[in-house]
């Protein structure tokens, strides 16, 4: 394994950490409706639990309302129950075959709690990125010990991985600022 391989591997893993963080942020509810909010909701479909997206079409009626239209009429009540029970504080209302899910307004206290959650998630993502940097640096040391690369190449590789780390930590900070702004917007 060379310096370039180690750097490329570290960058790919850091990118995956960012994508996982982005997915975690999407699950945090703001006052605005988005279809990804219901992604983790599981519905009892003839005895087995399946994601809501497999039994219903999910869309947006407006900025504060999600619409859920089950593909089978008899699934309406099961889907509504699953949404109500999914610890997001949502209160769905059925209108015929369509379930409307209005987004309740967030209280100031809840907004502050959510910002703390976002910061905690961000810290976890930063730690993951830094651990990947450490792993890459250990790989460089191993390559020097095996006399595969020189100490100068090790230093260059460490500097490049540090630049990657700084880039991804800055990206996490940017995403946090964006999410906090979204949460605090009334």
UniProtKB/Swiss-Prot annotation:
Signal peptide: none
GO cellular component: cytosol
Single GO term (MF): ribosomal large subunit binding
Main location: cytoplasm
Keyword terms of this UniProt record: Cytoplasm, Protein biosynthesis
Role played: Responsible for the release of ribosomes from messenger RNA at the termination of protein biosynthesis. May increase the efficiency of translation by recycling ribosomes from one round of translation to another.
Protein name listed in UniProt: Ribosome-recycling factor
Name of the encoding gene: frr
